[in-house]
């Protein structure tokens, strides 16, 4: 099996919501978030339906009683919704639905939303095909942290970032610090950049792409403490 695992974006909240025996992580009807895959970059999609598209429940919703979901029924429709133009990270599909997670890059705090959306309400956003160096350089913000990209030595870019995630009694932190050269539309590096990304060595694995005005960052949840991930869309602040 390829290296793939669910990020800490939303799964922890699910496990705290009810008895562990009621939750089946392998139930294909459960939307658990997005996965890291060594072989495949994260895909961003945009909501094209509207003006509102409501999330659809998983069986673990409503205190694990939404057993008939996901389905296109009033009982399976969540109160929360997205609007036309919102960008989401996508996970698996189940029938006519796609599992998505959403975090506004403009928010001041980390509030991830997740659930099923009708696949017909989404369209893929293609990454910038050949970003220039100037397209990467800058300070990029995401709720909870930021990443700085600057010119480095030997045609590489120097990348530094920090992330803070609130916990029950304290907070957890993560750090990125490496040098990497863009290849086509992607920056990919492991730990400090000294390990080739193609190898399965190292702990902190990171990929970056330019998607619209945003910097898409994804990691394997190995770049910090428990529940810490840099995964998300970042906006350039300077």
Predicted regions located by residue number:
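Pro/Ala/Gly-rich low-complexity, hydrophilic intrinsically disordered segments
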Residues: 112-137
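N-terminal glycine/threonine-rich, aromatic-flanked beta-hairpin/loop signature
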Residues: 145-192, 217-220
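SH3/SH3-like beta-barrel superfamily modules
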Residues: 24-41, 75-119
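Bacterial N-terminal signal peptides that target proteins for export
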Residues: 1-9
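Short, exposed beta-strand-loop hairpins at the edges of beta-sheets
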Residues: 216-229
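N-terminal signal peptide c-region/cleavage motif recognized by signal peptidases
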Residues: 17-19
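Tryptophan-anchored aromatic micro-motifs
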Residues: 129-147, 230-238
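Short alpha-helix capping/helix-loop boundary micro-motifs
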Residues: 67-77
């Amino acid at each position: 099996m390829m290296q793939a695992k669910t990020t800490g974006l939303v799964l922890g909240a699910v496990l705290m919501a009810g008895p562990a025996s009621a939750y089946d992580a392998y139930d294909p009807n459960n939307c658990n978030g997005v996965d890291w895959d060594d072989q495949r970059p994260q895909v961003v999609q945009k909501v094209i339906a509207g003006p509102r598209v409501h999330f659809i429940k998983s069986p673990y919703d409503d205190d694990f009683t939404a057993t008939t979901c996901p389905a296109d029924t009033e009982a399976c429709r969540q109160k929360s919704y997205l609007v036309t133009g919102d960008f989401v990270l996508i996970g698996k599909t189940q029938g006519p639905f796609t599992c998505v997670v959403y975090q506004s890059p403009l928010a001041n705090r980390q509030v991830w939303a997740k659930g099923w959306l009708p696949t017909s309400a989404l369209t893929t956003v293609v990454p910038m095909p050949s970003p220039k160096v100037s397209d990467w350089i800058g300070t990029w913000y995401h709720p909870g942290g930021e990443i700085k990209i600057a010119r480095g030595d030997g045609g590489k870019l120097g990348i530094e970032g920090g992330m803070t995630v609130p916990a029950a009694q304290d907070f957890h932190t993560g750090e990125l610090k490496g040098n990497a050269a863009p290849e086509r539309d992607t920056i990919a590096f492991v730990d400090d950049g000294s390990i080739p990304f193609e190898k399965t060595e190292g702990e902190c694995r990171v990929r970056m792409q330019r998607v619209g005005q945003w910097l898409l960052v994804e990691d394997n949840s190995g770049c910090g403490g428990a529940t810490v991930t840099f995964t998300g869309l970042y906006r350039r602040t300077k």
